[in-house]
Amino acid sequence: MEQLAQRVEDLEMKLAFQESTIDVLDQQVIKLNDLLAEQQHQLRVLISKLQSVEPSNMATQAEETPPPHY
């Protein structure tokens, strides 16, 4: 009977440890989810800013006339 009580106690300890681990991991998932949402917002802002940039008035290298010595 003592062996059974010891096994039950061991299982209760393992369960308590697993519950604690799950709580810690749950908090990490929440933090990472918040971080991901923030980074997605920053990326959307950056994309918006890049799309609103005026194209350069300088000609591309393909549009440039070659120098006279060619």
Curated annotation (Swiss-Prot):
Residues annotated as signal peptide: none
Pfam families given in the database record: SlyX
Top-level taxonomic group: Bacteria
InterPro entries per UniProt: SlyX
Family of the protein in this entry: Belongs to the SlyX family.
Record's protein name: Protein SlyX homolog
Native organism: Shewanella woodyi (strain ATCC 51908 / MS32)
Gene name of the record: slyX
